[in-house]
């Protein structure tokens, strides 16, 4: 008999949900994380009384009622609605592209006028077979929106011009012909009052957690403690990169406290011109409607990823997809180990989908 039923590698959302379900099923778990904190990339920390999203903006949204009810056991959610704005050389546009955006851009008032304007620009460009992201975007929304709101921002995000990016990156661009600035088409949306860390803490309540523990550096000793392993770290690192490293995009943040109560009037402002080096500025207090005397902002920079950097977004292209498929075969053949989460499955996961996946796996595993 080993000391624990499950060793859970990673105290992020996937690991915490699995731990919670295992505890309910009477199992004993040990959760470890190589960072000095729980909650993975949804970690929030208080600065000047403001919950700061250390790894970028996280806005919970879902259409899955069961997942919504699940998270509400661990936190009370506020009514925050994601309505980012774009700043293009001092011109402010609402996102996602909607009637407010078109009115500002062209002075059009009705949906019919906006549609006509977009169609006119698409026709003028005459693109029938888009060869790259630039042509694809223009064929979907016309030249003006592309030039002001897509070109510079997307180029910064990917570290190369849109003419060098494949067309398939944007299969569609959400265009709305209503005056609605709600970014997500989700039934349920909000931010947990008091931040995400407190929510994950509640999920892990009653489960042993050890921080600053690097699983891959001490694998054999840690494996000896438990019957099974739930691994939520990078799948390629688990196998010693034996097939090569999967690629990611990384993000870098410059966070500062400002002596003003309101810096930009919105939680998220995207800088869509090519000249501004950062992609967006997050003003954290607006996620929880804060009235503190000071404010905390984070400038977000997109960065090429190299081994050792924080991996954020999987690069979903054919090459990395094929490499992950090979790693998945190795993972499926690994006895006594469950691979899950954003890094374990090399997948861009919204929070609700991570919870869904962890609940599904836990239900099968613990039945």
Q: Residue spans of the language-model regions?
A:
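Short catalytic/ligand-binding loop motif for oxyanion handling, primarily in non-cytosolic enzymes
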Residues: 39-41, 88, 94-95, 146, ...
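Active-site/ligand-binding neighborhood in enzyme catalytic cores
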Residues: 89-93, 99-228, 232, 236-239
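Glycine-rich FAD pyrophosphate-binding loop
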Residues: 20-48
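N-terminal Rossmann-like FAD-binding beta1-loop-alpha1 element of flavoenzymes
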Residues: 4-31, 362, 366
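Mid-domain catalytic core of redox enzymes
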Residues: 215-330
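Dinucleotide-binding Rossmann-like beta1-alpha1 core, especially the glycine-rich loop
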Residues: 48-123
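C-terminal catalytic lobe of FAD-dependent flavoproteins
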Residues: 310-367
């Amino acid at each position: 008999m080993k000391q624990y039923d499950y060793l859970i590698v990673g105290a992020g959302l996937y690991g915490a949900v699995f731990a919670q379900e295992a505890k309910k099923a009477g199992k004993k778990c040990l959760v470890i994380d190589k960072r000095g904190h729980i909650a993975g990339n949804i970690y929030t920390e208080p600065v000047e009384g403001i919950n700061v999203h250390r790894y970028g903006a996280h806005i919970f949204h879902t259409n899955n009622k069961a997942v919504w009810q699940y998270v509400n056991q661990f936190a009370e959610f506020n009514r925050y609605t994601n309505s980012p704005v774009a700043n293009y050389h001092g011109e402010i546009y609402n996102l996602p592209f909607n009637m407010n955006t078109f009115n500002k851009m062209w002075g059009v008032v009705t949906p019919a006028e906006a549609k006509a304007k977009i169609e006119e620009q698409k026709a003028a460009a005459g693109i029938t077979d888009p060869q790259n992201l630039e042509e694809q975007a223009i064929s979907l929304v016309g030249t003006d929106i592309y030039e002001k709101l897509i070109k510079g921002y997307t180029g910064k995000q990917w570290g190369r011009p849109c003419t060098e990016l494949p067309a398939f990156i944007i299969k569609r661009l959400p265009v709305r012909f209503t005056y609605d600035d709600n970014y997500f088409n989700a039934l349920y949306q909000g931010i947990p009052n008091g931040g995400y860390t407190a929510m994950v803490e509640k999920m892990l309540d009653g489960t042993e957690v050890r921080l600053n523990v690097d699983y891959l550096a001490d694998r054999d000793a840690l494996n000896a403690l438990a019957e099974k392993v739930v691994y939520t770290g990078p799948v390629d690192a688990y196998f010693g990169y034996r097939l090569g490293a999967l690629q990611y995009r990384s993000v870098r943040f410059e966070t500062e406290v400002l002596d003003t109560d309101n810096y930009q009037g919105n939680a998220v402002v995207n800088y869509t011109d090519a000249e501004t080096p950062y992609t967006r500025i997050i003003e954290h207090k607006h996620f929880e409607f804060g009235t503190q005397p000071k404010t905390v902002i984070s400038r977000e920079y997109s960065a090429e990823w190299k081994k050792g950097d924080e991996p954020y977004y999987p690069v979903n292209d054919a090459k990395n997809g094929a490499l992950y498929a090979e790693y998945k075969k190795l993972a499926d053949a690994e006895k006594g180990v469950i691979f899950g989460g954003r890094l374990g499955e090399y997948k861009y996961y919204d929070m609700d989908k991570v919870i869904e996946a962890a609940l599904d796996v836990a239900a099968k595993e613990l039945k």
